[in-house]
């Protein structure tokens, strides 16, 4: 089977997080089953931010047993990346099904248009709460306008979908308010155990000479880093903390400056170790 997977970002932009890894893992597993898989995405590059686009990245690249096709982003508003070239890439290719991940995106809108035009099945999935994500709450006027504009686009994508895959019952309930129940299937996220194997000595590589708590993820306000720092501040003088540190590892999605200020204000410089841009 020929399968097109659509996502706002792909390798090497690992800082984008969950939906990128879901798309790459899915492509890897499907290609191992002898399907022909292509990921259609943007030219977002690896960086300590979510907005570094690189025209020098290959337009087409084979990774493992699947292909990545990139097109340049001409406009980005928050995490809404506009890359019109993807439409023409997808129109020129042939596939039996499209699976788009992260439906509050320009890429998913293009995927829905292509699926309708070519009359092929569209499968969609989302992560993080389509209508309940903290990013949708208490934001500035520009962000609120953007989300309002997205609503008919999101509904069009949902209406076009043959199947909706959710990772849990919580997300299923969200989608059930927007479409019929028989479209929705719960497929829980899996773990590729081969990817969990490592020969790298983490403590040696990053010169950590003590026990540690590890936060690994994006520096974003929705990740709860402020709560974590408040908690560490409460216990920093406990005897056990004399040999234990908090290691924060990731990339900046808008919260790094505030995070560093909190660490300084709480006098946690000797308790917290920051590792930016992990490989």
PLM regions with names:
Residues 1-54, 64, 93:
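N-terminal subdomain of nucleotide-sugar transferases
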Residues 4, 207-223, 229-234, 247:
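Conserved donor-binding/catalytic core segment of Leloir-type glycosyltransferases
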Residues 257-278:
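Nucleotide-activated donor-binding/catalytic signature segment of Leloir-type glycosyltransferases, i.e.
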């Amino acid at each position: 089977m020929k399968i097109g997977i659509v996502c706002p970002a792909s390798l090497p932009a690992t800082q984008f997080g969950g939906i990128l890894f879901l798309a790459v893992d899915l492509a890897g597993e499907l290609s191992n089953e002898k399907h022909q898989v292509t990921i259609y995405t943007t030219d977002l590059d690896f960086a300590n931010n979510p907005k570094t686009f690189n025209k020098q990245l290959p337009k087409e690249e084979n990774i493992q047993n699947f292909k990545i096709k990139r097109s340049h982003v001409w406009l980005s508003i928050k995490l809404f990346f506009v890359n019109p070239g993807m439409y023409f890439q997808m129109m020129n290719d042939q596939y039996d099904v499209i699976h788009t991940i992260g439906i509050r995106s320009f890429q998913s809108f293009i995927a829905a248009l292509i699926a309708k035009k070519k009359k092929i099945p569209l499968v969609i999935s989302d992560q993080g709460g389509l209508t309940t994500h903290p990013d949708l709450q208490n934001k500035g006027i520009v962000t609120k306008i953007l989300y309002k504009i997205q609503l008919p686009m999101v509904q069009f994508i949902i209406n076009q979908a043959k199947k909706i895959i959710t990772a849990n019952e919580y997300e299923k309930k969200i989608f059930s308010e927007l479409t019929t129940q028989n479209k929705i299937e719960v497929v829980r996220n899996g773990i590729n155990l081969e990817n969990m194997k490592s020969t790298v000595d983490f403590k040696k590589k990053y010169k950590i000479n003590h026990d540690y708590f590890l936060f690994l993820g994006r520096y974003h306000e929705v990740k709860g880093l402020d709560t974590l720092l408040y908690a560490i501040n409460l216990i920093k003088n406990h005897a056990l903390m004399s040999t234990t540190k908090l290691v924060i590892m990731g990339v900046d999605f808008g919260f790094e400056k505030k995070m560093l200020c909190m660490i300084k204000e709480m006098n946690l410089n000797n308790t917290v170790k920051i590792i930016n841009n992990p490989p």
